[in-house]
Amino acid sequence: MTDVTVKSLAAEIQTPVDRLIQQFADAGMTKSASDAVTQHEKETLLAHLNRDRGNAQGKLTLQRKTRSTLNVPSTGGKSKSVQIEVRKTRTYVKRDPIDAQQAEEEEQARREAEEQAQRAAEEQAKREAELREAAEKAKRAADEQAKREAAEKAKRDVAEKEKVTNQQNENMTKPAQAEKAKREAEAAELKRKAEEAARLKVEEEARRIAEEARRMAEENAGRWEAESAKPEESADYHVTTSHHAREAEDENDRQVEGERRSRSRAGKVTKQKKGNRQSESKADREEARAVTRGGKGKRKPSSLQQSFNKPVQAVNRDVVIGETVTVAELANKMAVKGSQVIKVMMKLGAMATINQVIDQETAQLVAEEMGHKVILRRENELEEAVMSDRDTGVAAEARAPVVTIMGHVDHGKTSLLDYIRSTKVAAGEAGGITQHIGAYHVETDNGMITFLDTPGHAAFTAMRARGAQATDIVVLVVAADDGVMPQTIEAIQHAKAAQVPVVVAVNKIDKPEADPDRVKTELSQYGVMPEEWGGESQFVHVSAKAGTGIDELLDAILLQAEVLELKAVRSGMANGVVIESFLDKGRGPVATVLVREGTLNKGDIVLCGFEYGRVRAMRDELGREITSAGPSIPVEILGMSGVPAAGDEATVVRDEKKAREVALYRQGKFREVKLARQQKSKLENMFANMTEGEVSELNIVLKSDVQGSCEAISDSLQKLSTDEVKVKIVGSGVGGITETDATLAAASNAIILGFNVRADASARRIVESESLDLRYYSVIYDLLDEVKQAMSGMLAPEYKQEIIGLAEVRDVFKSPKFGAIAGCMVTEGIVKRHNKIRVLRDNVVIYEGELESLRRFKDDVNEVRNGMECGIGVKNYNDVRPGDMIEVFETIEIKRTIA
């Protein structure tokens, strides 16, 4: 016969291929869909399937449901009906002749074993009964014998006593009486000893019999245990030998036993309901009561059940406490309720709620008061361990100086640096001003110098402060024609705060109006004294445009660096500071890091503030890929988990997992401090909030190209807030304007400001659909000016009252329609109808209202000019007298602006 494949066989017998392959596998044959199947394999598979099917064909399971209604009493004396459904399952197994014969033999053996055990037990019980009867009989005989002996002895003693008494009564003397008393005492003593001996003899006999009975009982108990331990007598006999059938039979037995117990409980319930409360014991009555209540009552625990007793001795635990902990967390650490902790704190004089954060000292006092051992843990322990586990070199070498160029706006800082680097960076800056820190290192004939160019605008104070902290020497650029300006003074203050030496570059020396001596004089007023005047600062006259004095400036910088003896460890793990950071759409978070010590290599794990990551790529200031950077070298690194804050310390660590833990800890700590600062309510703030009126808010979503610019703009916008209009920055960040930013602006009714960034397509769609205000800027001046205009539009307008006319009342006429009409002469200005007026009497305002009627002769007119007569009717006022003055004015709205 031709072989067929598994797939064709499955199609022939109309079964899935996967199922047929599984059946082959169950039969012990591994097949795939394309394998051939022989006739022998078909027969093997068929036999396997028939064998499996045969196991199940002899088994029949029947289910039966019976429903009944039970009336049970409930609260209030009422009864309610409960539907009870009883489900019964019976399984019947068909036995084959072999199994039936084997089961019959097993049943016969079991019955014989039971009969034999029963006969042995009956014989043993009979022997024990005989022994007990013999022991009791012997005990009774001994008791009777002792009683008889005691009675006979007592009779003999009485007879002898009577005989002696009779003999002595005939002739009794005093010595005879004494002898008689002595004998009577001896007789009583003998009687007592005899009774004691008889009692001891009876007790000894009883003990011997009891010991014999106990020994026989122990022997019988051991023999019964040995017989019960035999497997053929203790095994659970089944009707069939099939494993599945036995399981079904056991399940059936369990259900039958459960039904028997259910019937027993139901019978008890019925008896309870009918009033028959003659239960066997108190436990039965409690069980019946629990069933009657529908299971809600608690059943008395049986004497055989174990019960857990609460330990009396208090458990002392080791409680680990951090710098801050809530009352609930402290209670969990001590395994007590929060209310107990609050009670202890109240006893110690501290009031707290369960969610209140308490400090480490308070938590320590509470835990020790409750008898626990306190282990204080520092929160930054992991951070200190990570920072200490670093490879740092030991040999310090000379390094290049880090020079920061500072000065006022447009004094030529970037142009000076451009000339040194022979590039034109200022042309790429919007408006010709530097918007963020630029870090560059240049090679000179005398050595390498790293320059940091800081913005000069007042808004970038924080950036300038960070630049001073990361620098060794400050080059203060002052224009010779402009002199000392506000940002120049600020730069001097930053340099002094950082204790950094200052080299003054007097720029624009080629201009005709240049006055270097004036610059020296002005700087000397702020503590920057030139060397020729006995000071410590070097003054160099330069021209960034013509290139004059550039070499002298570099020599002065290198000379100052030699005096400082700048050294750094070149080997080992790197340590640096983030100069600037931003989010690049294609490369992700980018951070400009100035290496302070060690060597930063590609692939190092860097921990930087709240962020961490592995350095995936490094570039220098010209955009070239590099693999390592030594001290005083600024580099751009990629691979951080987020955009770090400018000014954060960047440290290379060993373990990325620990770096992640430290970064997450810092984030959580910052969040806790921020929330605590927000939730802290001071008394003066409460009064200020109570007294301040309605304040308008200008919501802003700010996105910038770099972190430093974002911080500077945010700070400047916050300073624009007034008592009436406040600037609220609902969202800020680094990178392009995304759909999330637009959604946030729409939800908070904010305007979107983009500084050197643009919105993507999805964000523009939301801006158009929601009609949001989206504005782009490249110069900070324009941004601040337009925000001021927007805030000015939100200010409440001011109103000014301007007097436009004055009329003198000459006479008063009565009108049936308007009441008192004042006949007036316009002495100044113009009188207009429906304007506000004031009535003055003796130059005192006695009424302020509205001009209702204005007539000239009998005609209604809208206005009457100076030198003309008219009739004026004042609305809702009739007390007009001759000689009064009527002052006509109008209210003018004055638009306010923010200075």
Swiss-Prot record:
Residues 453-456 are annotated as: G3. Keywords: Cytoplasm, GTP-binding, Initiation factor, Nucleotide-binding, Protein biosynthesis. Residues 108-164, 177-236, 277-290 have a biased composition (Basic and acidic residues). It comes from the Bacteria. One of its GO terms (cellular component) is cytosol. GTP binds at residues 407-414, 453-457, 507-510. It is found in: Cytoplasm. Residues 262-276 have a biased composition (Basic residues). GO terms for molecular function: GTP binding; GTPase activity; guanosine tetraphosphate binding; translation initiation factor activity. The keyword Cytoplasm applies. Pfam families: EF-G_D2, GTP_EFTU, GTP_EFTU_D2, IF-2, IF2_assoc, IF2_N. Residues 543-545 are annotated as: G5. Residues 432-436 are annotated as: G2. Residues 398-567 form the tr-type G domain. Residues 407-414 are annotated as: G1. This is Translation initiation factor IF-2. The lineage of its organism: Bacteria, Pseudomonadati, Pseudomonadota, Gammaproteobacteria, Enterobacterales.
